[in-house]
Amino acid sequence: DNTRSRGLGDVYKRQQCDLLIGTHGQMTPESAIRLSSEIEKYDPFWLEEPVPPNNSDAMAKVARHINFPVAAGERLTTKYEFNEIINKQAASILQLNMGRVGGILEGKKIASMAEANHLSIAPHMYCGPIVAAANIQVAASISNFLILEGIKDWKGFDCKIMKKYFKWEAGSVLLNEAPGLGVEIDEDMIESFPYDG
């Protein structure tokens, strides 16, 4: 509602940060368009999955009727699903996750498809440290990389199970010189957390 969007705008102005709106596909096209008209004045960075990602026609309708980018793809798993989003111009930012799309090679193929259509890539970083490292490597190797999307600080358990890990500085990830993905699992530490399921 209008009161909430005003409050959100006030927080955004104080924080001096980008405003990324995610709905996890829980809206109708009409409600997403209506919400977008309310929040447009705050210059959102994107509206993520305004409708279910398997309904590319509905998502394209939203994309045509709002004045800031639609982002989608965190739940998509194949280049064919991404191709449908691309062809229908349903999103201008694709959020692939190397752990879901079949790995680095498939991720790079999707990124190339997006690049050929002037779309950006924002790898989805809601994952464990190995997939995060793969997302980072792909991000560093493509020309249409936008941001790494995530809310974790990559401290705590993720760092405990790794011997070598990537480092963050001023909001950016620093690639290291280590081979492969640039990370190394601490197998002794992992053994201290047995799965009994």
What positions do the PLM features span?
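Shared catalytic-loop signature of beta/alpha-barrel
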Residues: 37, 43-46, 52-172
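Conserved anion-binding
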Residues: 16-19
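C-terminal extensions of enzymes
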Residues: 161-197
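Ligand/substrate-recognition segments at binding pockets and active sites
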Residues: 25
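Single conserved hydrophobic/aromatic residue that forms the stacking wall/gate
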Residues: 1-12
